[in-house]
From Swiss-Prot:
UniProt cross-references to NCBIfam families, sorted A to Z: mnmE_trmE_thdF, PRK05291.1-3, small_GTP
Species: Anaplasma marginale (strain St. Maries)
Binding note for cofactor: Binds 1 potassium ion per subunit.
Protein known as: tRNA modification GTPase MnmE
Function, as annotated: Exhibits a very high intrinsic GTPase hydrolysis rate. Involved in the addition of a carboxymethylaminomethyl (cmnm) group at the wobble position (U34) of certain tRNAs, forming tRNA-cmnm(5)s(2)U34.
Gene3D superfamilies noted in UniProt: P-loop containing nucleotide triphosphate hydrolases (3.40.50.300), Probable tRNA modification gtpase trme, domain 1 (3.30.1360.120), tRNA modification GTPase MnmE domain 2 (1.20.120.430)
Name of the gene: mnmE
Residues reported in the UniProt entry to bind Mg(2+): 228, 249
Gene Ontology MF term list: GTP binding; GTPase activity; metal ion binding
Residues the record lists as binding GTP: 224-229, 243-249, 268-271
Length: 443
């Protein structure tokens, strides 16, 4: 893969559609017009209608053509965009012509070039990928903020502060007779202030990452209490087998759902009971594992046994506030009805009649509002960011007042490097490959 190549790709999903967009980027991007039989000059930043031809001068399609000369384009290179009809035949014929001169882009290569040409940093690039992959409104809001530079500005501010502190310290090291010794006190004070800012940022309860991936909700209970029925209802499709025979569900099933604009991963689990069946026991172990790691637990109990539930025994290790209690199969319940049993609030739910389901969904949304970022929050969104920021915080926390100035300077260089890895001010090819390979081909 050479940066000198001119590349092209379909930037819209493959398939029949009203419009398809083909993007060409590189030094020779404008040659795509000559290649496709367009003889008139194409004006920059003006949408023009052109007929595109194959090498035999047979018309392929009429296209809206846009030309963005570099560096004032997304990639920082000359870019041509062809908006054509979303016909598989049109796309295939245009690809056949373009491929005689240009190379098909690798996944994420347009965004990679934008990064390498200084148009975006790595946090913005990752925000763009998250924006493309967002499925709920809350995910979209977070991804848009990141792609707009919220994280970039914060992390660059920290990195710049470290560079300034390091500059003052190195001036003291190189010219001790000309620089006041008070500079050392100032260095340590500023380092501690920056460390406090880093720690506050890291102490976010992983809310940004949870929003990016979805809040995990485990549906738990004994066999035949309606777990799979509720799971299918929340998933809006029949994913789990529903049977009157206990032990039907023996594995973990997952469904990504949007509840009130927030992303959830709803998990169906095996009924928890004593069993001699090896496969069922494995399913029960997985159910207990989900119970231990889920962000939210929905614990189902049959409405018919409301007088003798054994709530406290049902949750191994005690209740940690993550559990929503449900009396299932409550066909005669009233909408929104709840009941206090053994000191716990229970939602009465009947999937069969749909009673109580809205109240349960509202309870899940309330948990999401508490567990996800608030509007305007600037939070860590990936483990890659968190790892480098934790490393920077650890290095800074190891600095002591008694350390020689030269050692402090080395620690500050390491911390600066770690924060630079988040934004891409410091990077290696392996980091870039790992980030951009997750992008779609046309982005």
């Amino acid at each position: 893969m050479s940066r000198a190549d001119t590349i092209f790709a379909l930037s819209t999903p493959m398939g029949k559609s009203g419009v398809a967009v083909i993007r060409v980027s590189g030094h020779d991007a404008l040659k795509s017009m000559q290649l496709l039989g367009v003889k008139e000059p194409v004006r920059s930043r003006v949408a023009t209608c052109k007929t595109l031809y194959d090498k035999k001068r047979q018309p392929i399609d009429q296209a809206v053509v846009l030309y963005f000369p570099g560096p004032g384009s997304f990639t920082g290179e000359d870019v041509v965009e062809l908006q054509v009809h979303g016909s598989l035949a049109v796309i295939r014929l245009l690809f056949e012509e373009l491929q005689t001169v240009f190379r098909i882009a690798e996944p994420g290569e347009f965004s990679l070039r934008a990064f390498l040409n200084g148009k975006i940093d790595l946090t913005r690039a990752e925000g763009i990928a998250d924006l493309v992959n967002s499925e709920t409104e809350a995910q979209l809001r977070q991804a848009f903020a990141q792609s707009s530079g919220f994280l970039e500005r914060l992390y660059e501010e920290w990195r710049s502060s470290l560079v300034d502190i390091l500059s003052d310290l190195e001036a003291y090291i190189d010219f001790p007779d000309d620089v006041s010794p008070q500079i050392l006190r100032s260095v340590h004070d500023r380092v501690k202030e920056l460390h406090n800012s880093l720690e506050r940022h890291l102490d976010d309860g992983h809310r940004g990452e949870r929003l990016r991936h979805g809040m995990r909700v485990a549906i738990l209970g004994k066999p035949n209490v309606g777990k799979s029925t509720l799971f299918n209802h929340l998933a809006r499709r029949d994913m789990a087998i529903v049977s009157e025979y206990p032990g039907t569900t023996r594995d973990v099933l997952e469904a990504h759902v949007d509840i009130g604009g927030y992303p959830f991963i709803v998990v169906d689990t095996a009924g928890i009971r004593e069993s001699t069946d090896f496969v069922e026991r494995e399913g029960i172990m997985r159910a207990k594992s989900e119970a231990a790691t889920a962000d939210i637990r929905i614990m189902l109990f049959p409405h018919s046994e409301a007088g003798n539930l054994g709530v406290h025994e049902a949750i191994e290790g005690g209740d940690d506030g993550k559990t929503i209690y449900v009396l299932s199969k409550a066909d005669s319940a009233k909408e929104g009805e709840t009941r206090i049993i053994e000191g716990k609030q229970f939602y009465l739910v009947s999937v069969h009649t749909n009673l109580g389901v809205d109240s349960l969904l509202s309870a899940l949304k309330e948990r999401a509002i508490d567990g996800f970022p608030k509007s305007g929050d600037v939070l860590i969104t990936s483990q890659r960011h968190r790892g480098h920021l934790q490393s920077a915080a650890k290095v800074i926390s190891d600095i002591t007042d008694e350390m020689p100035a030269e050692i402090v300077a080395e620690y500050l260089r390491l911390a600066t490097k770690e924060i630079g890895k988040v934004t891409g001010a410091v990077y290696g090819d392996d980091i870039l490959d790992n980030i951009f390979k997750r992008f779609c081909i046309g982005k």
